[in-house]
Amino acid sequence: MNEKIRSQSVLNTLETFFIKENHYDMQREESSIVNACLRYLGYSKSMCHEKMPIFMDIAFIEYCFNLSLDPSSFQNLPITQTQPDSQQILWEYSLISNALERLENIELERQNCMREDGLVKYTNELLLNKETLNNEALKLYSCAKAGICRWMAFHFLEQEPIDHINFTKFLQDWGSHNEKEMEALQRLSKHKIRKRLIYVSQHKKKMPWSKFNSVLSRYIQCTKLQLEVFCDYDFKQREIVKMLTSNIN
């Protein structure tokens, strides 16, 4: 069985979990099967440019970056146990490139859904909330994408020897958010490992992964809420909002 056929078979398996119900609960018994499928598709080159349903793209991002979006998972836990750890993420070139592509697909689908809904049924207040949510999602998406790119670049710079071919390709594909910064990283890659490690250590302190993890989590939550409120998706997001509100009160 060639890779494309195998990938399609895995995709069909995932469809039974996501498509039929418009959402997926990662606490369910089948979560290990879903995780295995997502992991396989993350490495499948034949799937890199395949359009997947937004539910599956979101699930892949949550899995790939170890996001915990359920507030109940944070209850009764010491703060040290809720801090995101970059070491729990597999900073592998093909996987992160695929994740960035999935993240881009989510944003495109989100924007399409927001444009296509029927505006006539909404009050002025709801339309104002829609615009506010949309602006927030755009900012969060831009920041999250830039953070993932930086941390993947950090991983490349920590390696000895550096994989210059994939490093250059990664910067060309995903570094357009800040060309000057990417050019500086490219120059740094030609220095010895000691200088690279000093640079990475300093910048990891300035831009910790916990910051970008928080931004990415908020972006996914914001996207789910928009799709649920304005486009009739069902991510159980309203239940999460209720839980957060009750905790604050």
UniProtKB/Swiss-Prot annotation:
GO terms for MF: DNA binding
Main location: cytoplasm
Localization (cell): Cytoplasm; Nucleus; Chromosome, Telomere
GO terms classed as biological process: telomere capping; telomere maintenance; telomere maintenance via telomere lengthening; telomere organization
Coiled coil: none
Keywords: Chromosome, Cytoplasm, DNA-binding, Nucleus, Telomere
Gene Ontology cellular-component annotations: chromosome, telomeric repeat region; cytosol; nucleus; shelterin complex
Domain of life: Eukaryota
Summary of the function given for this chain in its UniProt record: Telomeric DNA-binding protein that negatively regulates telomerase and telomere length.
Name recorded for this polypeptide: Protection of telomeres protein poz1
